[in-house]
C-alpha cells in the first residue's frame, strides 16, 4: 500500500512495470505455518532470499529495484551481491550503517497497544509539511502491523543489516546506485546517507527537501519531483 501512488502513476507505468509485494507477516501476506512458536526476526539472509525468490519466480527482465527504510538497506545489499541481475537500485532512506535510538522492547509488550506505539515511534519521522491525509495513511499502516513484527523488522534495520565494511565493494558501473533521503529523517539521516555515498564510489545522492522517512506514501506529489529524474536517468543509460 505504501507504493500505491507509484502503481497508478502513468508517467512511471508507461516505461516501467511496477510491482510491489507484501513480505510474509506483512500486509495481506500471511506468516508461515507455526509462526506462533517462534519470535519473528528479519535477518539479512532471509530478506535477500525472499526478495530474490520473488524476482526470479516472476521472470523479471532488466529490473530496477527500489526500497524504503529497511527496503532501502536491502537494495544496497543486493547492489553488492546481485549487481549483474539488477539494472539499478534506488535506496530510499537507506544506509549501510545505522544505530538504534530507542528501546525496542516497547514495541511488543502485553501492557502496551502494539499498533499505536509503533505508529507513535515513527510519527516524528514524517515531515511537518506532509499532507495530513497521507501522514495518517502512513501511520495507519504501522497501526495495523501484527504483534512483534515491527520489532522483528528493526532487528535487520538496526543490527543485522549493517555492512559498511563491505559496501565499498559495490560496483556502480555495473549496477548504478541512487540514494534518496528526506531532510526530516532522524533515523536514516542525511548525514548517514552522505556517509554511505562516500563509501560507495559513484553513488548518486539526493537529500529531499520537505520530506521525511516515507517519501512515496507521506507526500507522493512532492516525491515525483525527486523520483522522476532518477527514473529518466536510468532509462537514458
Could you describe each region identified by the protein language model?
Residues 17-66, 225:
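Active-site loop/oxyanion-hole signature of alpha/beta-hydrolase fold enzymes
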Residues 76-117:
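Flexible "cap/lid" loop of the alpha/beta hydrolase fold
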Residues 67, 71, 75:
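Gly/Ala-rich beta-loop-alpha elbow adjacent to hydrolase catalytic centers
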Amino acid at each position: 500500500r505504501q507504493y500505491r501512488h507509484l502503481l497508478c502513476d502513468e508517467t512511471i507505468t508507461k516505461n516501467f512495470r511496477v510491482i510491489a509485494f507484501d513480505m510474509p507477516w506483512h500486509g495481506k501476506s500471511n506468516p508461515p505455518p507455526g509462526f506462533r512458536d517462534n519470535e519473528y526476526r528479519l535477518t539479512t539472509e532471509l530478506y535477500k532470499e525472499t526478495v530474490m525468490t520473488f524476482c526470479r519466480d516472476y521472470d523479471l527482465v532488466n529490473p530496477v529495484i527500489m526500497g524504503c527504510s529497511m527496503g532501502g538497506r536491502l537494495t544496497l545489499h543486493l547492489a553488492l551481491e546481485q549487481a549483474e541481475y539488477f539494472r539499478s537500485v534506488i535506496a530510499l532512506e537507506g544506509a549501510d550503517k545505522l544505530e538504534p535510538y530507542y528501546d525496542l522492547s516497547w514495541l511488543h509488550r502485553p501492557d502496551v497497544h502494539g499498533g499505536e506505539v509503533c505508529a507513535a515511534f515513527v510519527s516524528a519521522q514524517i515531515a511537518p509539511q506532509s499532507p495530513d491525509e497521507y501522514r495518517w495513511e502512513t501511520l495507519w499502516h504501522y497501526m495495523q502491523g501484527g504483534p512483534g513484527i515491527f520489532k522483528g523488522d528493526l532487528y535487520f534495520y538496526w543490527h543485522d543489516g549493517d555492512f559498511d565494511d563491505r559496501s565499498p565493494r559495490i560496483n556502480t558501473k555495473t549496477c548504478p546506485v541512487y540514494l534518496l533521503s528526506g531532510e526530516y529523517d532522524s533515523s536514516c539521516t542525511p548525514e548517514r546517507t552522505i556517509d554511505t555515498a562516500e563509501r560507495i564510489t559513484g553513488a548518486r545522492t539526493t537529500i529531499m527537501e520537505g520530506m521525511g522517512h516515507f517519501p512515496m506514501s507521506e507526500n507522493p506529489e512532492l516525491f515525483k519531483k525527486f523520483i522522476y529524474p532518477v527514473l529518466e536517468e536510468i532509462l537514458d543509460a
